[in-house]
Amino acid sequence: MKFQVLLCALAFSVTACAQTTSGTHAASQGEFAPTQVPPLPAKLEFAGEAVPLGNYDTRESLTREMLTTLYMHSRTMQTLLAWKRYFAIIEPILKKYGVPDDFKYLCMAESGLNPEARSGAGAAGLWQLMPAYAKSAGLLVGGEVDERYHVEKSTEAACRYLVDAKRRLGSWTLAAASFNAGVAGVSRRLEKQGVTSYYDLFLPSETMRYVFRVLSFKLLVGDPGAYGYRIGTEDYYKPLPEYKEVTVDSPTIDWTAFARGHGTNYKLMRELNPWIRDYDHNNKAGRSYVVKIPADDSRK
């Protein structure tokens, strides 16, 4: 009797599993969009320098990063939604320093255009600047004030780095690679391997992928719809609110009180000034800070 009951139970279990599996398989058909290999253009440049798409390894590397970028859907979509907001700030600064416009895509690859981005290695801000370089570039780096999060100042620091890297390495593409691996790291490998092009250079895995990741954003921003990203004009993040600038140099600064005293709140002030990292600042050095305040805060 027990054996018969066991057989019946086993038969029921197998039948149920078969029905579940069959049902799941049937339901899955037609529910998922096809996963496609992204098309590559016939020609491509970065910063006015040709990308050798005729080389099989170059094409495969670009395809790999296109796949990675395209199929990280939520992160990539958020990055795309933010580009109009931040490119309007970044582009004039690149032009001022003579840095090619394509470097705005490097900023996308670095931080996803999130001014609050911070890496496990300690890099921070839109350009993911490390503390040592930021300090050498004249930025303040601390727990209360950290100018790596200052959109304009960090962009200027990045530009100064890139101009110097281009002068030392000879090409903008190598300068871009050095933003990840350092000028010394790239220069040493160029000498060891006897090559002059980024695309012929064997580098640590992250740096070998780095420029291709930047290129993936260039292609995607150029035509999001071609890669399956449907974004209406009204979907893009609006520019940050118009602001007025207020200078403060008090020995101690209560940022919440400062914001209220200028007709806004701490949250909105922080969004315009992400370099402010705490509620208070002990300004013993007597530095002057230019703070952006919403020109017309309708919520106050």
Q: What does each model-identified segment do?
A:
Residues 4-5, 17-98:
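An acidic, Gly/Ser/Thr/Pro-rich helix-cap/linker signature
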Residues 10-18:
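Hydrophobic h-region of N-terminal signal peptides that target proteins for export
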Residues 268-300:
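Extracellular LysM carbohydrate-binding repeats and other cell-envelope/extracellular binding modules
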Residues 121-142, 155-158, 162, 186-189:
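Substrate-binding/active-site groove segments that recognize
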Residues 162-189:
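Catalytic and binding regions of secreted/periplasmic enzymes and modules that target cell-wall glycans
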Residues 99-116, 175-180, 269-272:
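Short, functionally critical alpha-helical segments immediately adjacent to catalytic or ligand/cofactor-binding
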